[in-house]
C-alpha cells in the first residue's frame, strides 16, 4: 500500500456495525514457507458472552463483556441478536444469517469508538486474521489495526473526541492510495509516536504518524481497510474462499516483533453509509 501525501479523499467516518468472523491464528515459523498453527489468540470472538436471553437493551457495560474493551465514553458495547429484535441489517428481503452463534457486536453504539482486545503473543510468530464483515444501511468501511500494546490504553478525550486508533484512520484516509469501495486493502504500515493519556501521544505536537520509522515514530502498526455492503456478509482473510484456494489478493498476516508479548487488535469505523454515527458495520466470530 503506497502512502502519498497528495491523497485527499476521505470517506465520512461513521458508525460501523461489523459482523466479522476474525480468527487470529499464530503460526510458528519453522522454515521457509513452512508454518504451524498453534492456537487462537482472540477470545470471545463470537460475542456469545454475555448471552442476551430476554434482555431488551442491546448494550452491555464493557466490564460485563469478557475479553473485550471499548474507548466509548459511556463504556458500553452494543450487541445484536434476533432474540432482542436487533437483526443485522434490519432490512427485509436480505439474508440475516449470523456468521457464528446467535450474537454479534456493534462497533459503535451511541458514539464513534474503538473495540479492542489484548492478546498474549510470542515474538517471531506470525498471526493470520480472518473476518466476516457487513454494512448496515449500505456500504460501510471498517479499519482493522494490529500493533504493540502501549503503556496507556487507547482512550477518547471526550464523547465527541477521537481516540488514538481513530486518529490513525484519519491519517490513513489522507495519505493512503488505492482504497477500494468494496473488499479489503493491502496491508498498510503506519508508524506512530507512543500513546499517552486521554487519546493523546507523547510529544503530541505536529503529526502523530508517519509512513517511515524514526526516533520519534517508534510504534509500528499494520492497518487494513475493509468495505462491505449490507446485502450479505463479506468474508476476508482466513475466512475468504480465496484464502482456502491459496490465491488471496492481500496479506492477512501480522508478524510479531521480537520481545512483543502483548499485542492489541483494534477495530474502528473508517466510514459508514449514512451520517448517523450510531449505525454502521457488524462483528462476529473473531
What are these model-predicted stretches?
Residues 24-36:
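Sec-dependent signal peptide cleavage junction
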Residues 159-260:
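Extracellular carbohydrate recognition and processing domains
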Residues 104-125, 247-251:
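Short beta-strands within extracellular/lumenal beta-sheet-rich domains
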